Amino acid sequence: MRLDNRGLQPPEPMQRTLKALEEMNIGDKLTIINDRKPMFLFEELEQKGYSYEVNSREDGAFEIIIIKKEG
């Protein structure tokens, strides 16, 4: 699944991302594109046991790849 949150104002990117996370099954991958690094999202992901990777893009946006782990 892929979400493009560029151009959206807070808290909409976070809300869209959390909703998509709820729909994920174990092993699923979600890729989001944000204008900013979603620092509050990282805390949420760590608390819920998701793994993630953050990449800076050439256009200045951030690509975050999230994987739902078991447990």
Residue ranges and their predicted role:
Residues 49-71:
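C-terminal edge-of-domain segments
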Residues 1-24:
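An N-terminal amphipathic alpha-helical segment
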Residues 12, 38-42, 66-71:
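Low-complexity, flexible helical/coil segments
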Residues 31-51:
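Short, structured protein-protein interaction patches enriched in aromatics and acidic/basic residues
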Residues 23, 43, 55-57:
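Sterically constrained small-residue positions within well-ordered secondary structures
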